[in-house]
UniProtKB/Swiss-Prot annotation:
Protein name per Swiss-Prot or TrEMBL: Ankyrin repeat protein C17/B23
PROSITE patterns with a match to the protein in the record: ANK_REP_REGION
Per-repeat ranges for ANK: 59-91, 95-126, 210-245, 249-280, 292-321, 349-381
Lineage of the species this protein comes from: Viruses, Varidnaviria, Bamfordvirae, Nucleocytoviricota, Pokkesviricetes
SMART domains xref list: ANK
Amino acid sequence: MIAFIIFREIGIISTRIAMDYCGRECTILCRLLDEDVTYKKIKLEIETCHNLSKHIDRRGNNALHCYVSNKCDTDIKIVRLLLSRGVERLCRNNEGLTPLGAYSKHRYVKSQIVHLLISSYSNSSNELKSNINDFDLSSDNIDLRLLKYLIVDKRIRPSKNTNYAINGLGLVDIYVTTPNPRPEVLLWLLKSECYSTGYVFRTCMYNSDMCKNSLHYYISSHRESQSLSKDVIKCLINNNVSIHGRDEGGSLPIQYYWSFSTIDIEIVKLLLIKDVDTCRVYDVSPILEAYYLNKRFRVTPYNVDMEIVNLLIERRHTLVDVMRSITSYDSREYNHYIIDNILKRFRQQDESIVQAMLINYLHYGDMVVRCMLDNGQQLSSARLLC
């Protein structure tokens, strides 16, 4: 009986000690998440904490995850201390991220800390264990020297766990979809094709490629924020990313831009700079390219800048195609104000253009006909029979 009591008491004491250790370690994980944590405050707790490397929070984060995902200014001394206590760099949380992946989402990325968090080795089965591809290139303040190190020396590439890899995107395509791509980083990525990194940096760059290029990705990924940078667009264009490139549906980068609520004429000029055919008619297909003029393809409010309209007209395309682009294919709605303004430009220049328009629009409705008549076109049986 006495022996039983002794063993029971020993068991209770052991449980209490284990609970105390767990409680202390969980407290430390919470403290590492505290924005006010400092090396001086946390050093003793880390050094005296038993089995710190074994404890994980409910999100799968170890002590390194907790600290490097903190919004504070990460202290390299704390990172070194945690590593010295055996906290794993290759531990993955419930999101599948190692501490390096968690840290790269941080707003203050430091190269020295990234170097500490990188881990790469071959196990007994000669399998490479590495976390290098966990690094997220979308960090706003990524250091250019760090980027060169990661790409050239460490061979970073899009993670196999992302849709980017499935879709075969290169680093340039991925980087331009980040919230604030920097021109100097983008330029280095574009110029880095000379390095043998084991995969293509850029895909679908040329006119013959019927798939999205980096301009398509950049414009479409910033539609919600409406935040396009002229410098980024110039950087892409100046480094052979084609403004003539068409996606799988045949759309140009400029057509992606027409869906923005606010259209900047300077960006339009960049995307039309090399004689882009914005009004091309594909054979007998009714698909027309001047989406800017067509209400169907614009967001609310639908505003039209006549200076941009003039840019479209000044291309080598015919007025007929421009006018067709104004109309909606699935309704009888027209922007008569724009039609009238466009026709005024040609009133004294070439009446044959207006005549051609009249023949094309006779079956659409008398409002369009009135606009044409008001701008100098005359009805005659001879012309109507043409």
